[in-house]
C-alpha cells in the first residue's frame, strides 16, 4: 500500500510541476457555461455525537503518521463518556439525546451522481487528498454501515480500468483499497465523462464508522493520486480546461451550509481584495505559508508557518509554541492526554486567533475555537486549535478555512488566495 506520507516524501525528489507525467485529461465534459456552484447539504445520516479526539486520530492516520497511544485512548475515553451521558439523559427524561450535529459542522456533504442512470452519493470535497473513491457494491457488507454505494454493474457507462488498482495505507497500519472504473461523474450539473472512480474492495474501520460519508472527492494535485500502475487525474484536473477560469473556491460556513464554486470567483462572497500566496508545488498538496499570527489583542508575530490547506481536516493544527501561547490566555485550559488535546471549561472566555497571508490578516472568532463539548452533559470543551507535534506538518483545517473565502487556483504555477468575507452569526 502507498501512504500519503510516502507520496509526500517521494514527491520532494521531483522538482517539477504537479501536472507532469500524468495521463491526458478527459475532453468530453458537459460544462454548462464552464462554471458551477455546489452547495453543501446537511446529511441526515450524521452521527449522534462528535468525538473530537477521533478527529485528531483521523488526521494522523490520513497523513500516514502513527497516532500516539494517548490519542487512541482518548478516543475510547470520550466514547465512554458520551455513551454514559446518553444513557443518563435517556434514563432521566425517557428520550434519547445528542449533541446537535450542526454544532460541530461535520454533517455537511456534497451530493454527486455517478453513472447511467445516475446513482446519488454524499461525498466530502477534500483538498487534502487526490483520490475519488467511494463505497461500492464490491465493499464487504460488514464494512458498510449505512453508507450509499456505487454499483458499477448498474451503470451502462461504467468501464473497468483493466489492471489498475488503488491502495492507501493509514498511520495505524490499516488501509483502504479497491479497483478502478471510469464512469460519468457529475457535481452540480458539471459532468466529466470517463472520470476515474475508485471503487472500494476494502475500507478501514475508521471510514466505516463515518456513516455520513459515502466517499471522497480528492481536490489535491493529481500527482498524489494512488491509482497504480498509472495515476489518474482528479475531477478538477479533468474539468479545468473546460472551465471559464482554472479555479475552484471554498466558502465554508460556521454552523451552516457552505458552498464550492468551480470555474469562477463569485465577488458577492467576499469583500475587498483576494490576497494570493505561492503554493509549494513539489509535495502535491495545497501547501503554502502563513506569514505569522497573533493571539487576541496581542502583537502580530511575523513567522513563516508552512502547512496544508485541507478542507477534509476538521481542526487547525499549528506548532506547539503557538498553541501553548494561545491557551495560556484561557482560564483552566490544559493539554490533556486523557482527552487527547487541549481542553478547557466551556464557560471560559477564549481570545480570537489571527493568521496572516502575506500582508493580509484573518481573525478566527473565539467561538470557532471553542469547538465542542466532550459530551452532552459535560462542562469541558475541546479546542479547535491543537498542536501539530507528531504530525510532521501543520494543517490549516476547517476551523481556519471557515474564516475566509479561499481560492484554489490551478494556474501554472498554482497559487492559493484568501479574502475577507461576512461571517455567520
Curated annotation (Swiss-Prot):
Enumerate the GO terms in the molecular function aspect: aspartic-type endopeptidase activity
What are the residue ranges of the propeptide?
29-91
Q: Where is the active site?
A: 126, 310
Q: Which residues are glycosylated?
A: 184, 273, 370
- What Pfam families is this protein classified in? Asp (PF00026)
Q: What induces it?
A: Expressed under carbon starvation conditions.
> What top-tier enzyme class does this entry carry?
hydrolase
Q: Is the keyword GTP-binding assigned to this protein? A: no
- Taxonomic superkingdom: Eukaryota
Q: What is its EC number?
A: 3.4.23.-
Q: Which residues form the Peptidase A1 domain?
A: 108-419
What is the residue range of the signal peptide feature?
1-28
Q: Name one GO biological process term.
A: proteolysis
Q: Cite the entry's keywords alphabetically.
A: Aspartyl protease, Cleavage on pair of basic residues, Disulfide bond, Glycoprotein, Hydrolase, Protease, Signal, Zymogen
- Disulfide pairs here are 346-381
Instruction: Enumerate the CDD domains for this protein.
Output: Aspergillopepsin_like
**What InterPro entries has UniProt attached to this entry?**
Aspartic_peptidase_A1, Aspartic_peptidase_AS, Aspergillopepsin-like_cat_dom, PEPTIDASE_A1, Peptidase_aspartic_dom_sf
Task: Write out the similarity annotation.
Answer: Belongs to the peptidase A1 family.
Q: What is this protein called?
A: Podosporapepsin
Biological source species = Podospora anserina
